[in-house]
Amino acid sequence: MAVSLSLVADIGATNARFQCCSISEDLAVDPVLVGEPLVLSTPTYTTEALLFTDVQAHFSATRFTSALFAVAGPVNLDGGAVEVINTGLQIHASEAGELLSTAVTLVNDFHAQAMAVPFAQQIRQVGGGAVLPQVKGVLGPGSGLGMATLVPNHGSYGVHWQVLPSEGGHADLAPSTFLEAELWSILAQKHDHVCLETVLCGAGLLNLYRAMCGLWGSEAEEISAAEISQRGQTMSDPVCHQTLEAFAGFLGSAAANLALTVGARGGVYISGGIAPLMLDFLVSSPLRRRFEEKGDLSDYVREIPILMVLDTQPGLTGAMYCLAEAR
């Protein structure tokens, strides 16, 4: 059984992580990450030539048969280029391939995060029934709101997964309660398009907090999303607590809408950097109740589990499985 050594990467606005992985040609053996990742500071690189020259120097003793990089930014239609969000750093598959002497594939970073979901090691289930090998929805509130669908393909070596990426985070935000309608009206005064990402990400939590302050008639403090989360979870600030309650409600509705839209009988997974930081709160919050409030389809969604992905670095794992599935 031939085994090849490949290179995968998770390139974000803050850090770029590169790691070797081993993939068998017939996929009879699960792929595995090899060694320790190389972690570089993305903002220190003004060009991809500088970045990949350092990567090549670090892995100079290794010859790669393929490479796949998950990058924080929209990949162009032909898959050949991407700009790392908030950095201006352009990455081209052809130039990276020349510098690293191997073929390079580019995918969006949430594409890789979604691919990592079926292989996550740390999961916490919130309600619903059994986790089935059926269509799965993935939501990822973090610096933005990623959204994707996982479709199973039952092959000779078990279930393989295809990621259907989307920009569902930019779908319209639909209020479901009078409170949410009031919040929406305040948000609409400051945002040309009030979408899910307007409230369901780090910056969105700040937007939601400021709108909540407007309803309370209080002045919004200059605080971070992390501080809002901390105050809300400890109940030391009633405005922050109600902000988190609203966040959980919007998240539950968005997760259920995704489940209904794609038929995610295999579960809706919540990944990204925010959920693990407020895990206990979300478990006891309106999240699950709002997920199940779907009128005639309440029984349908009641059987669908919500699963919190707690793995700290799913990007490299997802990139590895993306590369394996592309063979």
PLM feature segments, named:
Residues 126-128, 132-195, 280, 286-292:
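Glycine-rich phosphate-binding loop of actin/hexokinase-like ATP-binding domains
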